Design a protein with these regions (language model features):
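Recognition helix of helix-turn-helix/homeodomain-like DNA-binding domains
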Residues: 25-38
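Residues in the helix-turn-helix
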Residues: 18, 29, 58
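Short, basic-rich loop-to-helix N-cap that marks the start of a DNA-contacting helix
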Residues: 37-47, 66
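DNA major-groove recognition helix of helix-turn-helix/homeodomain DNA-binding modules
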Residues: 43-58
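Short basic helix-loop element that most often maps to the first helix and adjoining turn
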Residues: 3-22
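Short, charged recognition helix plus adjacent turn
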Residues: 50, 60-70
Length: 70
C-alpha cells in the first residue's frame, strides 16, 4: 500500500525512531510501513491519522485508483 508517511515524518524532522516512540511501535515497523513491506493495522492507521491530523485515506493509498461515484 502506498503511503505518505516518510514525507509527513520528514516535514516534522522526526527520525523513524521518534515516530516509532510516538506510535509505541518499533523503528523497524515504521520502516516497513514506509517502504510498503507492511500494512499497518487499523488501530495503528488511526493513530497515524490522529498524530498527523489527517484522514487515513490522506496518508494511505491502496493504488486502486478509485474515483468517487457521482
Amino acid at each position: 500500500m502506498n503511503n505518505k508517511l516518510k514525507v509527513l515524518r520528514a516535514m516534522r524532522n522526526w527520525s523513524q525512531a521518534e515516530l516509532a516512540d510516538r506510535l509505541d511501535v518499533s523503528r523497524q515497523a515504521v520502516n516497513a510501513i514506509e517502504t510498503g513491506k507492511y500494512d499497518p493495522s487499523l488501530p495503528l492507521a488511526f493513530k497515524l491519522a490522529r498524530l498527523f491530523e489527517m484522514r487515513i485515506e490522506e496518508i494511505f493509498d491502496d493504488g486502486e485508483g478509485h474515483d468517487d461515484e457521482k
